[in-house]
């Protein structure tokens, strides 16, 4: 897995279309007092050709040193579907919001936006990889 540095967040977010993606697998581990969250997403890569829609890819994210998280399922929302995904870096921690909502143009999400989410995680390190399709 590749480490995602805070300076690469914007570039990484442009690689994939997270809107309408799906959470396929979610694992929260606690080993030796260190929390780790592993999540596998089904997302579309950003389009390069205007005429063709690229097939979805599996994207695995791993957050180590988890400090805080919340995953709450509301009865009126579809299970596993993401409205959008946002990544932020605040006070030395990476935050991922799995049900991000749209902000006004030009507004940058703050830490309070991540903590207000029904599905978020905050931790020390963030790793990612594209999972190869089974053949």
Task: Identify the residue ranges that each predicted region occupies.
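Surface-exposed, interaction-prone regions used to assemble/regulate multi-protein complexes
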Residues: 1-135
